[in-house]
From Swiss-Prot:
Protein name: Mannonate dehydratase
EC code(s) of this entry: 4.2.1.8
NCBIfam families: PRK03906.1, uxuA
Role description: Catalyzes the dehydration of D-mannonate.
InterPro entries: Man_deHydtase (IPR004628), Xyl_isomerase-like_sf (IPR036237)
Signal peptide start-end: none
Protein's gene: uxuA
Pathway(s) per entry: Carbohydrate metabolism; pentose and glucuronate interconversion
GO biological process: one example: D-glucuronate catabolic process
Keywords: Iron, Lyase, Manganese
A family per Pfam: UxuA
Catalysed reaction, written as an equation: D-mannonate = 2-dehydro-3-deoxy-D-gluconate + H2O
């Protein structure tokens, strides 16, 4: 496996120089952040980002993500224009030599948490999802904001989107996802760009909005929409592992042996209720996921693709984007590399 690290570009307080100093770090996961959702990413911007990362001694391993416009998810008549723009972006990424694109199909909101600075017993802070707190939230107030959300939505935009989604149930969302996949994956095949859909985070419906990339059955349904390695998965241990009904290691092995795991997000979560969890340190004993078994499974199907430590705690007084500090993710990367070395040497 190839260790990578999420970087938010020039506005990220964590420099490429610091990321390069993490032992075993090979690549960067990033995106173009100043192009509005639905517009084509210019080739020159992609090449400039790639060159900046290569000049720092690493490679641009994964684009995360090329966002999918809401009109596509809603199945509006305008979707064809946005799908063609998406395909043109993939062509530009392919021309620039980008090989993997992570994306999601979550309506309106990306990953969702109820608190960004929950204090753990050791004094560190972490992201937490408390079902009761989320149920009390009003997403239409315009006051909620999380690092993964599209900040361009106004209060009026959100109200309109929620009105639009009243007509979209899970099966309609599946239909709209299938329409998107049938148009996009042939272009990905032509450009040799592996697509890797990210599971919904958390993997259940929120705020009355449908979510469908949530469990083994639905991931199987997804890959069967278009039978190609280019129609693949981002296997995120924290997202899928947040639902105690999901056996993440079993899912990882199953889809890995099918050759459909194109990217891996590795993080741990501690389950504290049926639909409540804390994000923990990567160490197995700190959470509910056995990270040794995760890495052992990756080795078992000879995974050579990119992996990145996902959301970390804030430790040692660090401040910045919640979940995306340097220190805990660097510890996570080193821990994962250590596990992989041990598994590899033990299986020679």
């Amino acid at each position: 496996m190839k260790m990578t690290f999420r970087w938010y570009g020039k506005d990220d307080p964590i420099s490429l120089e610091y990321i390069k100093q993490i032992p075993g770090m090979k690549g960067i996961v990033s995106a173009i952040y100043d192009v509005p959702v639905g517009e084509v990413w210019p080739l020159d911007k992609i090449k400039a980002l790639k060159q900046e990362i290569e000049d720092a001694g690493m490679e641009l391993s994964v684009i995360e993500s090329v966002p999918v416009h809401e009109d596509i998810k809603l199945g509006k008549p305008t979707r064809d224009k946005y799908i063609e723009n998406y395909c043109e972006t993939l062509r530009n990424l392919g021309q620039a030599g980008i090989k993997i694109v992570c994306y999601n199909f979550m309506p309106v909101f990306d990953w969702t948490r109820s608190q960004l600075d929950y204090r753990l017993d050791d004094g560190s802070t972490c992201l937490i999802y408390d079902e009761q707190d989320v149920e009390k939230m009003n997403p239409l107030s315009g006051e909620l904001s999380l690092p993964g959300w599209d900040s361009s939505y106004t209060k009026e935009d959100l109200k309109q989107l929620f009105d639009d989604y009243k007509e979209v149930d899970e099966e309609t969302l599946w239909d709209n996802l299938n329409y998107f996949i049938q148009k996009v994956i042939p272009v990905a095949e032509e450009e040799d760009v592996l697509m890797a859909i990210h599971p919904d985070d958390p993997p259940w419906n929120i705020f009355g909005l449908p979510r469908i990339i949530t469990n083994k059955e639905n991931l199987e349904r997804f890959i069967n929409l278009y039978d190609s390695k280019y129609n693949g998965l981002t296997m995120c241990s924290g997202s899928l592992g947040a639902d105690r009904r999901n056996d993440f290691v079993d899912m990882l092995r199953y889809f890995g042996e099918k050759g459909r795991v194109n990217f891996v997000h590795a993080r741990n979560v501690k389950l504290i209720g049926d639909k409540s969890f804390q994000e923990s340190a990567h160490l197995s004993e700190k959470g509910s996921i056995d990270m040794y078994e995760v890495v052992k499974t990756l080795h078992s199907f000879d995974y050579h693709g990119p992996i990145r430590p996902d959301h970390g705690r804030m430790i040692w007084g660090e401040t910045g984007k919640p979940g995306y500090g340097l220190y805990d993710r660097a510890l996570g990367a080193t821990y994962l590399n250590g596990l992989y070395e041990a598994v590899s040497k033990n299986n020679k």
